[in-house]
Each structure stands twice: as structure tokens, then as C-alpha cells.
């Protein structure tokens, strides 16, 4: 089960890296439309949370230390924060126009994305240590 846990954390890290790629694809798509960020939304709202839940289940079954289980579920919590950032940013927007306050809030979306990447990387390192039998 430790190999499954490691594999899921590796897939989670890959999904997070792809999330940044999909964000860039959406940002530079011409013409801009609601579907420009379709892959970014799908990956962020479905794939990353699913992999986080599966990695957490695998970690628990593999009986890894509690810190590693916490790292496995942390991306799901941070995805919830991502959604809240967008909702709050929209609340500070003025119809179709983005206000300076909304831009500050939306900027937190990118910073939180970096936090998700850091947690996914720590998760992968913890799974690798577990697999190799090295002390955490």
C-alpha cells in the first residue's frame, strides 16, 4: 500500500504542476472566453481534490505517520481556500470591471497555488521517505 500511496502523491504533484500550465494556457488564449480556463477549473476542482482524498486514504491504510496523513489531505483544504478566494474576489468586483481590491484578493489565488505546490512536494517527499524506510 505504500507504493500506492507514493504513486498517488506523485500523481498529485503532477496534477499541481499541470494546474500552473493550464492557468497559463487560459491566460494566453485568444479570444478570452469562459472556457479559456476550463482545464484549469476541471483539474483544480476535481482532479486535485480527488487525488488528495485517495492519497489520504492510501496513507491511512499504509499506516504512515499522522503528519504524512495531514500532508495528504492538506491540498484539499487549500483547494477550498482557492474557491473562497475567487468568491471573495468576485464580491469585491464591480460587475464586469475588476476593482483594485478584487485584484489584490485574486493575487492571493496565485500565492495559495504556490502553497498547494509546496504541500504536494512535501507530501511526495514524505511518501518517498516512507517507501525507502528512512526516518521521517
PLM feature spans:
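Polytopic transmembrane helical bundles with strong interfacial aromatic enrichment
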Residues: 1-136
Amino acid at each position: 500500500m505504500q507504493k500506492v500511496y507514493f504513486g498517488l502523491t506523485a500523481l498529485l504533484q503532477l496534477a499541481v504542476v499541470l494546474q500552473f500550465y493550464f492557468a497559463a494556457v487560459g491566460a494566453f488564449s485568444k479570444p478570452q472566453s469562459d472556457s479559456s480556463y476550463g482545464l484549469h477549473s476541471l483539474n483544480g476542482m476535481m482532479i486535485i481534490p480527488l487525488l488528495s482524498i485517495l492519497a489520504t486514504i492510501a496513507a491511512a491504510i499504509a499506516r504512515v505517520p499522522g503528519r504524512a496523513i495531514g500532508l495528504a489531505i492538506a491540498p484539499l483544504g487549500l483547494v477550498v481556500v482557492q474557491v473562497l478566494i475567487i468568491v471573495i474576489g468576485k464580491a469585491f468586483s464591480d460587475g464586469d470591471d475588476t476593482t483594485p481590491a478584487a485584484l489584490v484578493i485574486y493575487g492571493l489565488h496565485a500565492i495559495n497555488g504556490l502553497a498547494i505546490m509546496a504541500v504536494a512536494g512535501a507530501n511526495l517527499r514524505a511518501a518517498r521517505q516512507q517507501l525507502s524506510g528512512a526516518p521521517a
